[in-house]
Amino acid sequence: MFDTASLKYDANGLIPAIAQDHQSGEVLMMAWMNAEAVRQTLDSGRVTYWSRSRQGFWVKGESSGHVQKLVELRVDCDRDCLLLLVDQTGPACHTNRRSCFYTAIREGQEVVIMAPQNPSA
């Protein structure tokens, strides 16, 4: 059985987790997990993060319906970052965009490269 203690967490007991669409390879978002969030994710198959602002667990899509189902969890070579291959339902970003990475720096200017899926976002 996978031991979450084998991961390298920061001073706050957190590890960065990058969510990526398992089919398209699109990077969706980055959030934080602690050991218990990793355990809950592996046990339930629904991605659970640790919210630094709320200081509590955050099951992705619990309130919005924009669920992330875990397909595979990967650990980087230094064991200090996770890659979550997910099946994403709806937008991943709280701005109703498919990805949280919706701005780019092009020719020295920041530009929005992805519109919200729901214009009322």
UniProtKB/Swiss-Prot annotation:
One of its GO terms (cellular component) is cytoplasm. Binds 1 Mg(2+) ion per subunit. Binds 1 zinc ion per subunit. Mg(2+) binds at D76, D78, D80. It is found in: Cytoplasm. The keyword S-adenosyl-L-methionine does not apply. The keyword Secreted does not apply. Pfam families: PRA-CH. Zn(2+) binds at C77, C93, C100. It catalyses: 1-(5-phospho-beta-D-ribosyl)-5'-AMP + H2O = 1-(5-phospho-beta-D-ribosyl)-5-[(5-phospho-beta-D-ribosylamino)methylideneamino]imidazole-4-carboxamide. Keywords: Amino-acid biosynthesis, Cytoplasm, Histidine biosynthesis, Hydrolase, Magnesium, Metal-binding, Zinc. Pathway: Amino-acid biosynthesis; L-histidine biosynthesis; L-histidine from 5-phospho-alpha-D-ribose 1-diphosphate: step 3/9. Its EC number is 3.5.4.19. One of its GO terms (molecular function) is phosphoribosyl-AMP cyclohydrolase activity. One of its GO terms (biological process) is L-histidine biosynthetic process. NCBIfam families: PRK00051.1 (NF000768). Belongs to the PRA-CH family. This is Phosphoribosyl-AMP cyclohydrolase. It comes from Paracoccus denitrificans (strain Pd 1222).
